[in-house]
UniProtKB/Swiss-Prot annotation:
The keyword Coiled coil does not apply. This is Translocation-enhancing protein TepA. One of its GO terms (cellular component) is cytoplasm. It comes from Halalkalibacterium halodurans (strain ATCC BAA-125 / DSM 18197 / FERM 7344 / JCM 9153 / C-125) (Bacillus halodurans). Residues 11-26 have a biased composition (Low complexity).
Length: 256
């Protein structure tokens, strides 16, 4: 009978299985990390009360064709729903867009830029590292734009990849697409069309391409970007724009 009792005792060590509940708590941060990896979202539980939504545009802007997995990309099908949600959410009063992109698909980049430009809420862009190629229209689409002192922006003509049909219509299509980019940039910034095209078709700046590599202060001098600054100035400016958009309170009204 004693042996029978000893056989029952080994079942007791199974009680320490309760600590297995701890990984469930650790699983919450993993969900946030997975969301950041997949969608590039910066929202974490501590920022739920913030009235400013931040969107990052990094790597290569992916178009209708999926890029290789080793490429770090920004997918327009992820960015556009975030912009729509920010526009509809009453708790979000401003939008901060941070760019460090090499460019990418022209139509996808213009789609994002048009969405940003047509938002009713205050928007501010900040170029860190680089805002090259089709990243330029996105950078100038906001109400106010900043660029880091060491950041650069490459301005070059539109290019095609893959099979190209050598007919006059192809070059006409390229010219029209390029005019869309030029028109958008000059409309939403202080740079003139002549100056922008001069930078775009410059032959002595880039080694293996036509165009110009514009550094922080030069981008402001040309009128492409509004101001040189970092995250502090960008947040301060966005807060000012939010306060200006808010309706004034009636005189004599008590505010807490």
């Amino acid at each position: 009978m004693d042996y029978g009792r000893q056989d029952e005792q080994p079942e007791q060590p199974q009680q320490p299985e309760q600590p297995q509940q701890e990984p469930s708590q650790e699983g919450k941060p993993s969900g946030i990390i997975e969301k950041i990896q997949q969608l590039g979202q910066t929202n974490v539980p501590e920022m739920e009360q913030s009235n400013i939504h931040c969107i990052t545009v990094v790597g290569q802007i992916e178009g209708h064709m999926q890029l290789p997995p080793q490429n770090k990309t920004t997918k327009y099908e992820h960015i556009i729903p975030q912009l729509v949600a920010a526009e509809q959410n009453k708790k979000i009063e401003g939008l901060l867009i941070i760019l460090n992109t090499v460019g990418g698909d022209v139509e996808a980049g213009l789609a994002i830029a048009e969405m940003v430009a047509t938002m009713s809420k205050p928007t501010v862009t900040l170029v860190l590292g680089g805002g090259h190629s089709i990243g330029v229209p996105i950078a100038v689409a906001a109400n106010y734009s900043f660029i880091a002192e060491t950041a650069t922006m490459t301005i070059h003509p539109v290019r095609l990849t893959g099979l190209v049909i050598g007919v006059p219509q192809t070059f006409e299509y390229l010219d029209k697409m390029q005019e869309r980019v030029v028109s958008f940039v000059t409309k939403h910034s202080h740079i003139s069309e002549e100056k922008f095209k001069e930078l775009m078709f410059s032959k002595g700046n880039l080694t293996r391409d036509i165009g110009t590599n514009v550094i922080g202060t030069d981008a402001v001098t040309y009128g492409l970007i509004d101001e040189v600054g970092g995250i502090g100035k960008a947040m301060q400016k966005l807060t000012e724009l939010i306060e200006k958009q808010q309706p004034p309170h009636p005189e004599g009204e008590m505010m807490q």
